[in-house]
């Protein structure tokens, strides 16, 4: 199992400190990251995923007691966020194939082995949109594409930043179903949100407002 230990993290912008002396660990299940808008939820997710630098502190990812190589870690994660965009002119399937190719995806690295690969377009209920240009999709459909592409990498660690954004009631039910399945599978999950219903899906919550 892959595990996180964050020690004394600090991040600030010119005139505003988001968090400081922040320490926590996460080994299994779903860790919710809560807080008001602007509290640093999204920034913290990016920092622990090595997508943004921290100003101070240490971030340790280990697997079976051994430090995880950053390149291996990059291949082991999936990341879903509102600001992630894909190529408008490419189809959903072309975007999925392109992302996997450009990321150097190797299913034999840290990611879980799958005897029977999952059709994530079908799992996220957008199989019929596979040949549609991304730009023709609604915002809710685009959010499902983001989920499908992140999950197609079969990640050991999944970061979800406001995953229910732009989703209708059925889409939010899908999030709940996916999180339940991924938790059972052993995927390490991080969910940043200020939606109480989304946070109810978490095993424990790190509140940046306190």
Where are these regions (language model features)?
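Conserved ABC transporter NBD signature motif
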Residues: 57-73
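Catalytic Walker B motif of ABC-type/P-loop ATPase nucleotide-binding domains
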Residues: 158-162
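Helix-to-loop junction immediately C-terminal to a conserved catalytic motif
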Residues: 49
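Conserved ABC ATPase signature
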Residues: 133-138
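A short, flexible loop at the N-terminus of ABC-type nucleotide-binding domains that lies
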Residues: 1-22, 27, 55
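Q-loop/switch helix immediately C-terminal to the Walker
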Residues: 83, 89-105
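Conserved ABC ATPase "signature" region
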Residues: 97, 101, 111-129
């Amino acid at each position: 199992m892959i595990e996180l230990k964050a020690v004394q993290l600090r991040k600030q912008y010119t005139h505003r400190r988001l968090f400081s002396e922040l320490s926590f660990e996460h080994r299994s299940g779903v860790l919710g990251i809560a807080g008001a808008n602007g509290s640093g939820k999204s920034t913290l997710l990016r920092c622990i995923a090595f997508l943004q630098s921290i100003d101070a502190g240490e971030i340790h990812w280990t697997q079976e007691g051994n430090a995880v190589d950053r390149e291996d870690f990059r291949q082991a994660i999936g990341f879903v966020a509102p600001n992630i965009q894909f190529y408008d002119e490419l189809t959903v399937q072309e975007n999925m194939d392109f992302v996997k190719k450009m990321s150097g995806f190797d299913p034999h690295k840290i990611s879980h082995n799958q005897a029977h690969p999952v059709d994530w377009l079908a799992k996220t209920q957008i199989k019929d949109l596979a040949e549609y240009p991304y730009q023709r999709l609604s915002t809710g459909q685009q959010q499902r594409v983001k989920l499908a592409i992140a999950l197609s990498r079969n990640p050991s660690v999944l970061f979800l930043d406001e995953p229910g954004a732009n989703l209708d009631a059925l889409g939010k039910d899908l999030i709940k179903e996916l999180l339940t399945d991924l938790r059972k599978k052993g995927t390490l999950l991080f969910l940043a949100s200020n939606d109480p219903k989304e946070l109810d899906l978490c095993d424990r919550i790190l509140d940046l407002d306190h």
